[in-house]
Amino acid sequence: MNEVITRFQESLYESKLHFSVKPILIGGMAMEYYGMRKSGADIDLIITDEDYKNLAMQYPEKKKDLFGDLGLVIDNFEIWRSIAHLDYNFYKKEAMEEDEVFIISIDRLLWSRVCAMEVEKYRNDLMLMKEYYYKIYTNQEFHEEARLHEKSYEKIKGPIFGGKYED
């Protein structure tokens, strides 16, 4: 089992939090799940409106309102009903399903970082995500073909027309 999932499950058990619908893991732990960087101490989740209302009744002193996005901070969990007023259903699209949690899809994670890129931490995450996309999705055949002409690319510093390489 993935170490991130194990840590999530241990924290969930210790906190005694219960959800009627699997939460969606977002933020730093999702970045770690995809192998981009280590997460911080907090665990960021998106939950359904129903689960939010139930937890808000149990923990009224833990409620948080960030420009209309309602959440709770309980133990090391930061739990949101929405982010940028986008709800559970938006973030669930193409999410990875694990035993007790969904992991935000890589595309939704990228989108969330783009929306917050004025914050340096998230700009740095965008650079990590760019490298992740190149690592996972680069067509290796095309990449190897291009490597044959690296000297020409360095010398010409622009497009090469008519196959006139200077290797």
What is the predicted function of each stretch?
Residues 1-167:
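Compositionally biased terminal segments of proteins
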